[in-house]
A protein has these predicted regions:
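Class I S-adenosyl-L-methionine-dependent methyltransferase catalytic core
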Residues: 1-195
Length: 195
């Protein structure tokens, strides 16, 4: 696993800890190609960060800042190690926390995020993910023009799409699907979701 483009291009990232499924190079490459120049100067939130490969790729490609969140101590250590390897740690914050708890009570960046990438375990279903997506929708975390990207296995069950989001694009790579969500212009009622 390596950084694909940008200031840290070609730097090898450390091995994924046991139980962590890193986002494949081709998935990252396709995802970043699809969002293009919007990564320049973006504030990024990498949820279920694993090795940090997605957030590090964002930093390497010109993102202003990335916040990494994962609950596993081994994943947090891997993210920190990979940030040191790439010398991008001065533009990053790493938090060890359950994702839902982080969104409910964590020290979330008050300036908001332009891009949120979620790569939960493939076995995480709607009971875990729907509340996370709802929190992203109702809390003032997302900047105007945001993109939320959800990486799932092709056999993973689908959840509920927050009412204020629309599916902008689906990218398929073997056994992985990345769904890109964007803002839909609707009045906001806390907790509103679309089935």
């Amino acid at each position: 696993m390596r950084v694909i483009a940008g200031s840290a291009k070609g730097i090898r990232l450390g091995r994924a800890p046991a139980g962590v499924r890193p986002v494949a190079d081709r998935v990252r490459e396709g995802f970043f190609s699809s969002i293009g120049a919007r990564i320049e100067g973006a504030r990024v939130l990498d949820l279920y960060a694993g090795t940090g490969a997605v957030g590090i790729e964002a930093l390497s490609r010109g993102a202003e800042h990335t916040t990494f969140v994962d609950s596993a101590p081994s994943a947090v250590a891997a993210v920190r190690d990979n940030l040191r390897r790439t010398r991008l740690d001065d533009r990053a914050v790493v938090r060890r926390s359950d994702v839902r708890r982080f969104l409910e009570r964590g020290r979330v960046d008050p300036s908001g995020f332009d891009l949120v990438f979620l790569d939960p375990p493939y076995d995480a279903g709607p009971p875990e993910l729907d509340p996370v997506l709802a929190l992203l929708d109702v809390k003032p975390l997302l900047r105007d023009g945001f993109t939320v990207a959800l990486s799932r296995g092709t056999r993973s069950s689908n959840g509920v799409i927050p009412l204020h989001w629309l599916v902008a694009r689906r990218l398929s790579y073997g056994d992985s699907v990345v769904t890109l969500f964007r803002s839909r212009s609707l009045p906001r009622t806390p907790g509103s979701m679309e089935v």
